[in-house]
Amino acid sequence: MSVADKPFVRTSILAAEPPPPGERGAVAWIRRNLLATPKDVILTILALALIAWAVPHLVNWLFIQAVWSGPDRTFCATTLQGGIQPDGWSGACWAFISAKYDQFIFGRYPLGERWRPAIVGILFILLLVPMLIPSAPRKGLNAILLFAVLPVIAFWLLHGGFGLEVVETPLWGGLMVTLVLSFVGIAVSLPVGILLALGRRSRMPVIRMLCVTFIEVIRGVPLITVLFMASVMLPLFLPTGWNVDKLLRALIGVSIFTSAYMAEVIRGGLQAIPKGQFEGADSLGLGYWQKTRLIIMPQAIKLVIPSIVNTFIGTFKDTSLVTIIGMFDLLGIVKLNFSDANWASAVTPITGLIFAGFIFWLFCFGMSRYSGFMERHLDTGHKR
């Protein structure tokens, strides 16, 4: 047998070759994403021109020409407006934010009692951070403390009683109200939404009809209407002398509205589960609730994590609508302070809205990034 007729047997593994020079690095990314076609080149040039024009103006207005400290509006107004700045001046009035910062966070909460919401915030962070870390131990205990124990402690600290001065909810406001509304809405909407989604897929006609009616009615009206009904119409159906706290009405309205949307998100995840998963669970002899808890629901939630977090983000932003029922969240308390004569100037409203927008963006961006992290962490599917 000649050498040419012998079968080839590899005795060593060749080292991996690096990719071609033009396929990696920043230059390759720019060529592939920004300069791939003539249309991309034109759009890139226009975008760079817009950035080159806007960024210096924004930096100048937000930082260089900005007023960082001052006792009143005169530091944020020109001489023609009764201030000390030269005519033609324009810049952010961060002194307004600095002077009203405590009110933006706590609303009209009594100054001497603001240590109470501060403690609630610290407890919330201490319980939330381990909950967000996938590898953290004792998740069950952590969840009980966060969603069952903390609300009781928070209500006692924020509202008062049992030795603490009572602070009525009309005095609450600012970021504190935004976080309370969004946390309760999110914490209630997920389990209620799961039950509604399961009820809508139920084989029992009465339960299915009730869930479908609830979901479609709530989804068919705007949140403003739900809040108005909860605030104005709900007391009309209560016995004489009964009075439901305004904040509680808002919490009920936000929770109901978010639950209806969450139910449709969860239902979409349930419909995406292959039929074989249901049949496999049945073949193991699992009951309905065992099958749902152990096999079906974990997969459904994993599939719709982006939509769930998107609903959470929408809930956080929708809390600003409570101003129509006389409550002042972060945005509402910022806008309320525009009428303060001591800080009335042309740049005060713009600065206040930028501050509120940045706070909202910070929370929403954090939720979005965590959603992406959880998607990657739970991406256990088999890909070809």
From Swiss-Prot:
InterPro entries referenced in this protein's UniProt entry, alphabetically: AA_ABC_transptr_permease_3TM (IPR010065), ArtM/GltK/GlnP/TcyL/YhdX-like (IPR043429), MetI-like (IPR000515), MetI-like_sf (IPR035906)
Segments traversing the membrane: 44-64, 117-137, 144-164, 179-199, 220-240, 250-270, 319-339, 347-367
Main location: membrane
Domain ABC transmembrane type-1: 175-364
UniProt cross-references to PROSITE patterns, sorted A to Z: ABC_TM1
Free-text function comment from the UniProt entry: Part of a binding-protein-dependent transport system for L-amino acids, affects the uptake as well as efflux of these amino acids. Probably responsible for the translocation of the substrate across the membrane.
Organism expressing this protein natively: Rhizobium johnstonii (strain DSM 114642 / LMG 32736 / 3841) (Rhizobium leguminosarum bv. viciae)
Similarity annotation: Belongs to the binding-protein-dependent transport system permease family. HisMQ subfamily.
Pfam family, one: BPD_transp_1
Example of a GO MF term: transmembrane transporter activity
Membrane topology field: Multi-pass membrane protein
Keywords from the UniProt entry: Amino-acid transport, Cell inner membrane, Cell membrane, Membrane, Transmembrane, Transmembrane helix, Transport
Coiled coil start-end: none
Subcellular location: Cell inner membrane
Protein name: General L-amino acid transport system permease protein AapM
GO cellular component, one term: ATP-binding cassette (ABC) transporter complex
GO biological process: amino acid transport
